[in-house]
Amino acid sequence: MWFLTTLLLWVPVDGQVDTTKAVITLQPPWVSVFQEETVTLHCEVLHLPGSSSTQWFLNGTATQTSTPSYRITSASVNDSGEYRCQRGLSGRSDPIQLEIHRGWLLLQVSSRVFTEGEPLALRCHAWKDKLVYNVLYYRNGKAFKFFHWNSNLTILKTNISHNGTYHCSGMGKHRYTSAGISVTVKELFPAPVLNASVTSPLLEGNLVTLSCETKLLLQRPGLQLYFSFYMGSKTLRGRNTSSEYQILTARREDSGLYWCEAATEDGNVLKRSPELELQVLGLQLPTPVWFHVLFYLAVGIMFLVNTVLWVTIRKELKRKKKWDLEISLDSGHEKKVISSLQEDRHLEEELKCQEQKEEQLQEGVHRKEPQGAT
């Protein structure tokens, strides 16, 4: 089991190996072990004769070991540190950080730093291989995997969502919890963005170049990205090293949603772009001269009609205002005549009253005269 895990972890994500650089592998394949356990480090270089001399370094200092294998028996805290190796004329290996722990439960990982697409192996390991059951694996404090009986866990293709702090818990005589261990997954390349050489909508007949744009964030010998182009569910072009696709003569049937994929050669890392909408319009025929003549003639007639209507309406409004004024004046004169007639009637009534009073006085005088004569 350990041999298969080691072999799986040793193969790089892109299938390419720098044959001039040494690589350290571990047996068992864990970068953290308990005290008193045994671990062996192997210095490997492809296509290098086995008789080449080997140099080991611990925390930057050369050690006494000159064999391709560096064996640590009954590990102690003093064996913790950064290991590198070099064989013959090869380049010095990348560092391996080995940690020696004390405790009852230990979460073991195959490495602390990964490139996305590489496998991550985890093991919830008890002191002296004691029986552990009801095992839970956690990432950033949240349980994500449960085993009734203890079992190793492998994430075959890591991505940046697997960044975080991992720990495990399990039942023995009691419920035990391991310390946390930080795991970093480096992004190999960002998700691509699909761009077009012309803006949408566009006219039929145009040349359109689609570009699937991304870039490698980590450089490795022989690492190459492959690109595919799609319209909806239709494949326009399969895997190819060119990041461009051309529509030589755009037609209306080329309208649709386009997207692309970028992937490593082995397909371990594959990322899709957001969709890009292209709208192709039919060609517009040139407008004939007679149409322009008719158009401007119609506009002129409409302007003339509007002008005549405006003048007519204005005259009508003026005439109506004058007529309303005359009616108003006539109403005022009529009121004055009525008022004058009412005054004349009042005077006539007063004169009649006065005449009646005078007549009554005269009658009174005539009645008194005969009485005096007697």
UniProtKB/Swiss-Prot annotation:
Effect of N306D: Decreases cell membrane expression by 50% in absence of FCER1G
CC terms in the record's Gene Ontology section: clathrin-coated endocytic vesicle membrane; early endosome membrane; external side of plasma membrane; plasma membrane
A molecular-function term among this protein's GO annotations: IgG binding
Compartments, record wording: Cell membrane
Record has ATP-binding as a keyword: no
Domain of life: Eukaryota
Domain Ig-like C2-type: 22-101, 95-184, 190-277
Glycosylated residues, chain numbering: N59, N78, N152, N159, N163, N195, N240
Extracellular side: 16-292
Region: Interaction with EPB41L2, residue numbers: 312-332
Family: Belongs to the immunoglobulin superfamily. FCGR1 family.
Protein's UniProt name: High affinity immunoglobulin gamma Fc receptor I
Organism of derivation: Homo sapiens
Gene: FCGR1A
